[in-house]
A protein has these predicted regions:
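Conserved ABC ATPase signature
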Residues: 82-86, 345-349, 353
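Hydrophobic anchor residue at the start of the ABC signature
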Residues: 96, 124, 359, 387
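Walker B catalytic motif
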Residues: 109-112, 119, 372-375, 382
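ABC ATPase nucleotide-binding domain signature region
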Residues: 1-62, 145-176, 255-269, 273-325, ...
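Conserved catalytic loops of ABC-family nucleotide-binding domains
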Residues: 127-141, 165, 390-404
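Conserved ABC ATPase "signature" region
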Residues: 61-79, 326-342
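Pre-NBD coupling/linker segments of ABC/ABC-like ATPases
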Residues: 2-25, 46-67, 161-253, 312, ...
Length: 507
């Protein structure tokens, strides 16, 4: 082709295609205005000053549109807050709102679901569609939560290539076709296979009952009650309570088996992270129960690396035994593809690379119980499944215990053996306080069913890839499932396919 070309040549080259209209628009008399919601929102705190309400009104004075966005994103409770003290989920919703209120020709949203819970993710998708579609503007979204991408998109472009080397963008496909092509790892229009294996989402089926006696409970120091009492093949924790100025958290007593993963699900700000911190001794419960007797490895939600050296130096310095263990290399290190960034400085890593290193560090630390807070954050679709497999394989093979906080519903269903559901109600005596209650660990289907019922959202499973899909609000399928009380349908993978799933999972 031509090595150089002017705007007229470009338009002529794409004559007769959909791109001709786009380039006519792009190279028109008026330069198009583009607004972007960035991937990394942490820097917003240092750039934007003032309360949420003040900042949004300064960006755009259109109060009618602003009120619609406030309602859809549930921003009422944070309008008086200063931007620099917002939590991750609050900051994400503010950044989305700040993008939506602006007048532009092209809107771009880079990972708008990060730090949002399932309900907020669905509302975010509704908000983008309801606010921008009537304007007939270009809207581009980069998103790694497949269920939200499915709910939000009209068309999908698949990106594939070699990270840090090159990338290829496919032609647009309809939403379902695009997602299926990406999961298959094959672009039929280009006759190109970019992944050797298809991505399958399989339910984390409950493992066989552990056999044998429970053994003896090991007493803590001085006979005092501990957060965790060790039983052979089990750990149990008592009733836990923690009160903050705006929330009161009550966790029902529970029990978890070795080689089992319990997912903590619920809306943001209901105490899931506080529960994890109580288990690992970083927060003391109101009842005065002492710190756990177990060794704990904790991967926090927000990762702020301060290490000055390379990734290799960090890993061999922090987890030398794991780095020389062949089983750990096979189960975790190799699948997470860490060797490719060994020579990179930790300070230069991207969000996804930092997350992968943090997961490896957490799993590599010698511990009895592993607590992972949002391990999917900043990971792409394929990396999320790889991380879920690595976590699952490590916990099963090492016979450890694991709690995971995760808002990506697909990743949650892949990881979970049991589910703890967090629900919150406004305090009748004090309206500014929320009473949060967490259930004991529930079975997979009943747990997710209770969780989705609290959100008034229904999911079904794709017959082919088995990935969970959100039903459109008030659709026929949505109404039928709610009427039957089945908010999470697994009928598509009942007995015939269940045996296939069990036989196809290799640990």
């Amino acid at each position: 082709g031509l090595e150089t070309g002017d705007k007229k040549t470009v338009i002529k080259h794409y004559r007769g295609t959909e791109l001709q209209n786009y380039f006519n628009f792009l190279y028109g008399k008026h330069e198009p205005r583009i607004v972007i919601k960035p991937q990394y929102i942490e820097s917003v705190r240092s750039v934007v000053k003032g309360t949420v309400e003040k900042c949004l009104k300064e960006i755009n004075g259109s109060l009618d549109q602003l009120q619609t966005i406030i309602n859809l994103l549930s921003l009422d409770e944070i309008m008086g807050k200063s931007v620099d003290i917002l939590s991750g989920g609050e900051l994400q919703r503010f950044a989305i709102a700040a993008t939506l209120v602006q007048e532009a020709d092209i809107y771009m949203f880079d990972e708008p679901s990060s730090f949002l819970d399932v309900k907020q993710r669905v509302n975010m998708a509704k908000c983008i569609r309801e606010v921008l579609l009537p304007k007939e503007r270009y809207v581009i979204v980069v998103e790694h939560d497949i269920s939200i991408l499915d709910y939000l998109s009209d068309y999908i472009c698949c990106l594939y290539g070699q990270p840090g080397v090159y990338g290829i963008v496919s032609a647009p496909f309809t939403c379902g076709e695009g997602i299926n092509n990406y999961l298959d790892g094959f672009i039929p229009t280009d006759n190109t296979r970019f992944r050797s294996e298809a991505i399958d989402y399989k339910i984390a089926l409950c493992k066989d009952e552990f056999k044998g006696s429970l053994g003896k409970i090991e007493e803590g120091m001085d006979g005092d009650e501990k957060v965790v009492d060790i039983i052979r093949d089990y750990i149990s924790y008592p009733l836990l309570r923690k009160t903050y100025p705006t929330i009161s958290i009550t966790v029902e007593p529970g029990q978890i088996r070795s080689s089992e993963i319990v997912c903590l699900v619920g809306k943001n700000a209901l105490g899931k992270t506080s529960f994890i911190k109580m288990l690992c001794g970083k927060v003391e419960p109101d009842s005065g129960i002492k710190v756990p007797v177990l060794n704990v490895s904790y991967k926090p939600q927000i990762i702020e690396p301060t290490y000055k050296g390379t990734v290799e130096q960090l890993l061999y310095g922090k987890i030398p035994d794991a780095m020389s263990n062949s089983q750990f290399k096979s189960d975790v290190l190799k699948p997470m593809n860490i060797s490719h960034i060994f020579d990179n400085l930790v300070s230069t890593l991207s969000g996804g690379e930092i997350q992968r290193v943090a997961i490896v560090l957490a799993l590599g630390k010698p511990a009895d119980i592993y607590l992972l807070d949002e391990p999917s954050c900043y990971l792409d679709v394929e990396q999320r499944l790889v991380a879920a497999r690595a976590i699952k394989r490590f916990i099963v093979n090492s016979h450890k215990y694991c709690f995971v906080v995760e808002h990506d519903f697909i990743m949650s269903t892949y990881l979970a053996d049991k589910v703890v559901v967090f629900e919150g109600l406004e305090d009748e005596k004090e309206s500014s306080r929320v009473n949060s209650r967490a259930t004991s660990p529930m079975e997979f289907v009943s747990g997710f069913n209770a969780f989705l019922k609290s959100l008034d959202i229904t999911f079904r499973r794709s017959k082919f890839s088995m990935r969970p899909r959100i039903n459109k609000q008030d659709s026929l399928r949505d109404r039928e499932q709610k009427r039957e009380g089945k908010y999470f349908i697994t009928d598509d993978i009942s007995e015939p396919i269940k045996s296939f799933v069990e036989n196809s999972i290799e640990w």
